[in-house]
Amino acid sequence: MSHSQRTYDLLIKLLLIGDSGVGKSCLLLRFCEDQFTPSFITTIGIDFKIRTIDIGNQRVKLQVWDTAGQERFRTITTAYYRGAMGILLVYDVTDEKSFNNIENWYQNVQSYANEGVELILVGNKCDLDEKRVVSTEQGQALADKFGIPFLEASSKTNINVEECFYSVATRIRDTVAKTKGNESGSGGINIAEGEENSASKCC
C-alpha cells in the first residue's frame, strides 16, 4: 500500500461505554476535536470520530466509537464490542447509579469483547467537586478489583482526557509490537478496515 493511501502504521478501534448522560460524547468531542458542548445531544445508537496520534515513532489512527447508554440500544451496541482493541468504561462522579452500573458494563465486556482487550475506568466530570458523590478512592478500588487502570477526567476543563486515550492506545501498541515480534514476517495489524464510512452518525 502506498504512503498516499495509508498515512498511519496502526489502526485501533476504541469503544466508550457507560450509562447515558455520563459524558461519553463530550469525552469523544474533547479528544478528537478539542471542543466542549454542555448541551450535547444524547447519542442515538452509534457514532464515531477519528484522530491520528503519535506514539513513539509510530502514527496511530484511533477510531473511537461512542455508544448509546440507554437500555433500548443495548442489543445494537453489543455488536460493536467485537473488534474493539480498547474500551473506556465511563461513569459520572456526580451520579452514584452510573458508578454502580459499571459492574454491569464490565460484565458486558467479559461477555462480548475480544479476549485481551485493554480497559480503563474513567470517572468523568471531576471538575464538579461540589456535586461529587463518588470518591476518587471508590473509583480506584473498583479499578483495582477489575485489575485495570483508573483516571478521573473532565471534558469541560480538559483534565486527563488525553491521558485516558493515550494510556489505552499505548498499551495496545505495545501488545501489538510484542505480537509482531513473536510472529516474524506477519502482516500489519489493521482493525476494523472498511468501517470508517459505515457508522450511523448523529448530531
UniProtKB/Swiss-Prot annotation:
One of its GO terms (cellular component) is endosome. Its main location: membrane. It comes from Yarrowia lipolytica (strain CLIB 122 / E 150). This is Ras-like GTP-binding protein RYL1. Belongs to the small GTPase superfamily. Rab family. A motif (Effector region) lies at residues 40-48. GO terms for molecular function: GTP binding; GTPase activity. GO terms for biological process: exocytosis; protein transport. Keywords: Cell membrane, GTP-binding, Lipoprotein, Membrane, Nucleotide-binding, Prenylation, Protein transport, Transport. Pfam families: Ras. SMART domains: RAB (SM00175), RAN (SM00176), RAS (SM00173), RHO (SM00174). GTP binds at residues 18-25, 66-70, 124-127. It is found in: Cell membrane. The keyword Lipoprotein applies. It is a lipid-anchor. Gene3D superfamilies: P-loop containing nucleotide triphosphate hydrolases. Residues 181-203 are annotated as: Disordered. A lipid is attached at C202, C203 (S-geranylgeranyl cysteine). Protein transport. Probably involved in vesicular traffic. Coiled coil: none annotated. PROSITE patterns: RAB.
